[in-house]
From Swiss-Prot:
Its main location: membrane. Residues 424-451 are annotated as: Disordered. This is Uncharacterized lipoprotein in oleD 5'region. It holds the Pfam family SBP_bac_1. Keywords: Cell membrane, Lipoprotein, Membrane, Palmitate, Signal. PROSITE patterns: PROKAR_LIPOPROTEIN (PS51257). A lipid is attached at residue 19 (S-diacylglycerol cysteine). It comes from the Bacteria.
Length: 451
C-alpha cells in the first residue's frame, strides 16, 4: 500500500511540474516569427536581431519565417483558420481590424512593458487599438514626400521648401508649371492606389471625409478641405495638361523612377522608403533631393498606417512573444530596423538617433515630419475596404483622368453615407468573432500619456 501511495504521489508531482508556468516539459519555448521585411538591408537587420535574441535567450528560441506583403492578408487568414498562424506577426495597422474583430489576435494592453508603451506616442497606438484592446505594436512608418530632380529645381530658380517653410498647395502647382517644358513634366502622380494617397495627404488641407457623430456612426462628407489635394491632382493632369501626365495615374511608384532619372518628370510624390530604390538604381549623374509634401490648413499633417508586430491569440507563450517584441523594439534595435527599411521609427527615443538626422539621402527631412504623422483617416472605419474598391477608387480614377467633375465625386459620396459604420454598443468586443468597433479612446486611455 505504501509503495502504491508513494508511486501515486510521484506521478502527481510530475503532473504538477508539467503544468507549472514558465517550465516547459519539452525544453525551450519556440516562437514562430513571420517577418515581411523584403529589402536586403531590412531582411539582414531583422535576421541579425533574431540571431542576437537566440544567442542570449536559450530558453526562448525564435524561428524566422519569411512572409510577403503581396499576399499577407489572405495567407494570415488561411493560417488563422487552419490553426497554423505564426506566434509573432509582422503586418500593417490598416490590415489588423478584421483579425482583431475575428478573435485571431491577442490583446496586448495588459502585456506591454512600461518602457515600450511610453516610448511610442499615443497617436501611433491608436492605429492598432480596437475597442478596449491593443492588437499590435506600431514600429515603422513613412510619410509621403516629394522626390525631386535637384538640377531641374536649380535651373528653374524655384524656392526650395523645407519642413519649416513648405510649399502651399497653390505654390506647388505654380512650381510644377515652372518645371514643365517640351516633353518634360513638372510632376508625375503614381496613383495605382488613389484613395489612400489622396485621403492621407488631404489631412494637410484639413480634410477628414469620414465624420463620426455623437451616436458613433460614420458618414462620408466631401467638404472644402477634402477638395484641395484632389483638385490639385485633377487640374495638373486634366487642366494644365502639360504639367502632369495622365499615363502615370495607374502606375505604382517604382514605375515612375525611370522617367524621373531620365528627366521626363521633375518631381514624384512617393513614400519615404523609395529612397533606397533611388540610391540603388539612379545613374551616378542624377542629383536628387527629398522635399516635404505641400502644406495647407492642416500644416504638414499626413495620415499613415504604421507597420506593426502582433501576437496570435492562439500563441501559448504570449508573455515570451511580447518580450521578444520588446527586444526588437529597443531604441537602438528600432533604429536598425528603420535604417534597414528606409523608414521612420515610431519610438520617441529612436527618433533622436543621429543617424536619422543627417541630410544625406533626405533623412533629416523625413524625421522632421514624424511629429505631424497621424492615423490614416480610414483606420477606424468598418466597411472601408469594400467602399474603397467599389466606390472611391472608380470615382477618383474618373475624376483624375478628366472624365468627371468634382460635383460627380461629391454625388458619388452622397450615396454612401451608411456604407461605412462602426459597431453598435450591442456588439461583442474585439477578440470575439464578428465583433465590432468601439471607442478607440477606451484602450488608449490605459496607456501612458506620451507626445
Amino acid at each position: 500500500m505504501r509503495t502504491r501511495i508513494t508511486l501515486a504521489l510521484a506521478v502527481l508531482l510530475l503532473l504538477l511540474a508539467g503544468c507549472s508556468p514558465g517550465a516547459p516539459a519539452d525544453g525551450p519555448v519556440t516562437l514562430r516569427f513571420q517577418s515581411l521585411a523584403w529589402q536586403p538591408d531590412s531582411v539582414a537587420a531583422t535576421k541579425e536581431l533574431v540571431g542576437e535574441w537566440n544567442a542570449t535567450h536559450p530558453d526562448v528560441k525564435v524561428e524566422y519565417i519569411q512572409g510577403s506583403w503581396d499576399s499577407v492578408h489572405d495567407q494570415l487568414l488561411t493560417s488563422f483558420e487552419g490553426g497554423e498562424a505564426p506566434d509573432v506577426i509582422h503586418d500593417a495597422s490598416d490590415d489588423l481590424a478584421d483579425f482583431a474583430y475575428g478573435g485571431y489576435l491577442a490583446d496586448l494592453s495588459g502585456l506591454l512593458p512600461a518602457r515600450l508603451a511610453s516610448d511610442i506616442p499615443r497617436g501611433s497606438w491608436e492605429t492598432a487599438t480596437f475597442g478596449r484592446g491593443v492588437y499590435g505594436v506600431p514600429f515603422l512608418q513613412e510619410p509621403r514626400v516629394l522626390i525631386a530632380d535637384a538640377d531641374r529645381l536649380r535651373a528653374a530658380k524655384v524656392r526650395i521648401p523645407t519642413p519649416g517653410h513648405p510649399w502651399s498647395w497653390p505654390e506647388f502647382r505654380q512650381v510644377a508649371k515652372k518645371l514643365t517644358g517640351p516633353g518634360r513634366y513638372g510632376v508625375a502622380w503614381p496613383l495605382k492606389e488613389p484613395v489612400s494617397a489622396t485621403l492621407n495627404l488631404s489631412l494637410s488641407a484639413g480634410g477628414r471625409l469620414f465624420h463620426r457623430g455623437a451616436d458613433d456612426k460614420v458618414t462620408v462628407r466631401f467638404e472644402a478641405g477634402d477638395e484641395v489635394v484632389a483638385r490639385t491632382i485633377h487640374d495638373q493632369v486634366a487642366v494644365d495638361r502639360e504639367h502632369a501626365p495622365a499615363s502615370t495615374l495607374g502606375s505604382g511608384g517604382a514605375d515612375t523612377l525611370p522617367g524621373l532619372f531620365g528627366g521626363r518628370y521633375a518631381m514624384v510624390p512617393l513614400g519615404f522608403s523609395y529612397r533606397q530604390q533611388i540610391v540603388r538604381q539612379a545613374p551616378e549623374d542624377f542629383h536628387w533631393q527629398v522635399l516635404p509634401a505641400p502644406a495647407g490648413a492642416g500644416g504638414l499633417t499626413q495620415g499613415v498606417s504604421p507597420q506593426t508586430l502582433s501576437v496570435s491569440a492562439d500563441c501559448p507563450h504570449k508573455k515570451e512573444a511580447v518580450a521578444f517584441i520588446d527586444f526588437l523594439l529597443r531604441p537602438r534595435n528600432m533604429v536598425r530596423l528603420a535604417l534597414g527599411d528606409w523608414m521612420l521609427p515610431t519610438g520617441t527615443q529612436a527618433l533622436k538617433d543621429p543617424a536619422l538626422h543627417t541630410a544625406r539621402h533626405g533623412w533629416a527631412t523625413g524625421t522632421a515630419l514624424a511629429a505631424r504623422l497621424r492615423p490614416a483617416p480610414a483606420q477606424s472605419v468598418r466597411g472601408y475596404p469594400e467602399w474603397k474598391d467599389k466606390v472611391a477608387t472608380p470615382a477618383y480614377q474618373r475624376y483624375y483622368s478628366g472624365a468627371s467633375t468634382l460635383a460627380d465625386v461629391r454625388h458619388a459620396w452622397s450615396g454612401t453615407a451608411t456604407w461605412c459604420w462602426p459597431a453598435t454598443s450591442a456588439d461583442p468586443p474585439p477578440g470575439v468573432p464578428r465583433a465590432g468597433k468601439r471607442n478607440i479612446r477606451d484602450a488608449t486611455s490605459r496607456l501612458p500619456s506620451t507626445p
